[in-house]
UniProtKB/Swiss-Prot annotation:
Region (Disordered): 1-31, 191-231
EC number(s) given by UniProt: 3.1.3.-
Location of the FCP1 homology domain: 277-436
Protein name (Swiss-Prot/TrEMBL): CTD small phosphatase-like protein 2-B
PROSITE patterns xrefs: FCP1
Cross-referenced NCBIfam families: HIF-SF_euk
Superkingdom: Eukaryota
Presence of the UniProt keyword Hydrolase in the record: yes
Top-level EC class: hydrolase
PANTHER family: DULLARD PROTEIN PHOSPHATASE
Organism in which the protein naturally occurs: Danio rerio (Zebrafish)
TM segment ranges: none
UniProt keyword terms in alphabetical order: Hydrolase, Protein phosphatase
Length: 460
């Protein structure tokens, strides 16, 4: 009985033990089913929304990458914008000068090497831009002025671009020569007899002629030599002879080989209005710089007047010296001549100066500027045909005979003036100019016989 009872007692225990096992199996089966359903649901969610775990892992890395990009790229973009703006400024002013790129640090920390723009011409000074420019003489290798047509076209294109630009151009403040080189030429006091060119100067003689600090480096008012010539103080190089320099810088060599006017230039519309009944019959064309006045951007203690000029968003102060007997000459000549000022300088400067000197236009009736000149291989020549006046009754006075290369018989050369208070060249011309009006004839034979500029032209 006991054994049976034990067995009986053990049977329910086994039964009871078997039930949990069976229950566990059912629970595991339920858990497996629940896990499979959860896995299926999770897969559906992943398919629809994507993996949340991956998003949580990607977001920090992406945020870190963007933060690094924001910190390092901002100055780069700023530098890039600055560099682009500087390059635009350089392109705007590359024709008239070069600009300095102050942004020399690249984003990688290396120094940026400024590259020279090949197509840009060398820098020209402000004086050569708003004042009368220096003439480019023909070189011995290009005597016929036709050996390099590409250079000629390029020079003329550059000049046209200069004229098309507004006043906002290259700012620079260098005091250099504004007029062509002063070389031996006849003055108004010379006799009608032909004088030979001056003899060659030795380096010792040239070293004694030290120009004034205010004068342009290549031009200086010399003292009249024997025969009525004006001997310019030109530094002679260590090697080479004076004859070689004479061949390069002789203005009459320039005049001899200047190309003829084109059909377009010959048919230009006159820049002046028609004469009125009160207009004098004869016209007198006058140059400005070194003929009537001398202007400088350096402060002049003896300046007669000074005025500001706005040029390329920069204000420059111009100091002006008036040639002795400047006003007396104009007042006397304006009574018998139609006075026309014709300068190769920029209008922004010359027009403002004339507004100060002659505000009511009582002395100078008309004003012509650089845009009215003819550009020949980069040089500005004053073609008198643009006046629309009778050339038989027109005279031009200029300190550079190259300026009236196309009407040599109408031109009277005058010594360049800078600061000599004892100068009286303007007064010396008064009797001759008055006589031309009294004769009432073609002025060209008289001017030609008096100054004999054609005799200074080199032989064929």
């Amino acid at each position: 009985m006991r054994l049976r009872m034990r067995k009986d007692s053990q049977q329910p225990t086994l039964a009871r033990r078997a039930c949990p096992a069976r229950t566990k199996r059912k629970s595991s089966e339920v858990e497996e089913c629940t896990g499979e359903s959860k896995a299926l649901l999770s897969s559906i969610k992943k398919f629809i929304h994507g993996s949340s775990i991956k998003v949580e892992q990607d977001n920090p890395a992406k945020t870190s990458h963007l933060s690094c990009e924001l910190i390092t790229s901002t100055p780069q973009r700023k530098n890039d914008l600055q560099r682009k703006s500087i390059y635009r400024a350089r392109r705007r002013t590359s024709i008239n000068g070069e600009t300095t790129n102050h942004d020399t640090n690249k984003p990688n920390g290396k120094l940026e090497v400024t590259e020279e723009v090949v197509s840009s011409p060398p820098r020209t000074t402000l004086l050569g831009t708003i004042f009368s420019p220096v003439f480019n003489f023909f070189s011995p290798a290009n005597k016929n002025a036709s050996n390099s047509p590409d250079q000629v076209v390029e020079a003329e294109e550059i000049v046209k671009q200069l004229e098309m630009e507004q006043v906002e151009e290259m700012p620079t403040c260098t005091a250099t020569s504004r007029e062509p080189l002063s070389v031996p030429l006849y003055t108004s006091a010379m006799t009608s007899a032909f004088r030979p060119p001056p003899t060659a100067h030795t380096p010792e003689q040239e070293s004694e002629n030290t120009p004034h600090p205010d004068l342009p480096p290549l031009t200086a008012p010399g003292s009249p030599a024997t025969g009525g010539y004006v001997d310019a103080s030109i530094t002679v190089p260590a090697e080479g002879s004076y004859e070689e320099e004479w061949e390069v810088f002789d203005p009459y060599f320039f005049i001899k080989h200047v190309p003829p006017l084109t059909e377009e230039q010959l048919t230009r519309k006159p820049a002046l209005p028609l004469k009125t009944r009160s207009t004098p019959e004869f016209s007198l064309v006058l140059d400005l710089d070194e003929t009537l006045v001398h202007c400088s951007l350096n402060e002049l203690d003896d300046a007669a007047l000074t005025f500001p000029v706005l040029f390329q968003d920069v204000i420059y102060q111009v100091y002006v010296r008036l040639r002795p007997f400047f006003r007396e000459f104009l007042e006397r000549m304006s009574q018998i001549y139609e006075i026309i000022l014709f300068t190769a300088s920029k209008k922004v400067y010359a027009d403002k100066l004339l507004n100060i000197l002659d505000p009511r236009k009582q002395l100078v009736r008309h004003r012509l500027f650089r845009e009215h000149c003819v550009c020949v291989q980069g040089n500005y020549i004053k073609d008198l045909n643009i006046l629309g006046r009778d050339l038989s009754k027109t005279i031009i006075i200029d300190n550079s005979p190259q300026a009236f290369a196309y009407q040599l018989s109408n031109g009277i050369p005058i010594e360049s003036w800078f600061m000599d208070r004892n100068d009286s060249e303007l007064l010396k011309l008064v009797p001759f100019l008055e006589k031309l009006v009294e004769l009432n004839e073609d002025v060209r034979p008289h001017v030609r016989e008096r100054f004999r500029l054609h005799d200074l032209l080199p032989p064929d």
